């Protein structure tokens, strides 16, 4: 999928992403939850730990996004990220025995908190809002949460998503 598409029915869409830069020792996470009309329900920008790989950053961002959705009270979620390796691992029925297996196990446990959870992999173009929030978090020393308000760091990306919904 090249552009953001709304979820069906009563579900909410949760997009997540990580930003990792070679000049900084840490990662940063972004997550956005929107309804079927594309309206922002809540968004998150947060600093993360040092990561050794993009997969590690993405799987940590996924876990953070799911914790965020649970804490905000969402129970019907379409979860989307743009790292195919992470999404394939999440969808696999096999136990992940890699060095990141314990994080995948945490995610598996978190998924039991949802009445409905669908997981999908999207192209970067469909995940721009979450990526914008992850990039913004590199400037933060703390976590920022926006409730029912469009996060300023993602205004442009949200606008472009809205325009593409009506094309």
Residue ranges and their predicted role:
Residues 1-167:
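Primary recognition of RNase H-like, Mg2+-dependent phosphodiesterase/nuclease domains
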């Amino acid at each position: 999928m090249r552009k953001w598409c709304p979820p069906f029915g009563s579900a909410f869409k949760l997009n997540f992403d990580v930003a990792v830069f070679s000049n900084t020792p840490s990662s940063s996470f972004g997550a956005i939850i929107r309804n079927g009309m594309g309206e922002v329900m809540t968004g998150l920008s947060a600093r993360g730990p040092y990561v050794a790989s993009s997969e590690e950053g993405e799987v940590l961002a996924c876990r953070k996004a799911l914790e965020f959705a649970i804490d905000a009270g969402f129970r019907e979620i379409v979860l989307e990220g743009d790292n195919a390796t992470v999404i394939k691992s999440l969808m696999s029925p096999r136990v992940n025995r890699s060095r990141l297996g314990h994080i995948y196990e945490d995610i598996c446990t978190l998924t039991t908190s949802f009445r409905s959870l669908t997981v999908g992999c999207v192209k970067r173009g469909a995940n721009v809002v979450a990526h914008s929030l992850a990039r913004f978090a590199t400037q933060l020393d703390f976590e920022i949460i926006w409730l029912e308000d469009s996060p300023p760091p993602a205004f442009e990306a949200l606008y472009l998503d809205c325009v593409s919904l009506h094309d």
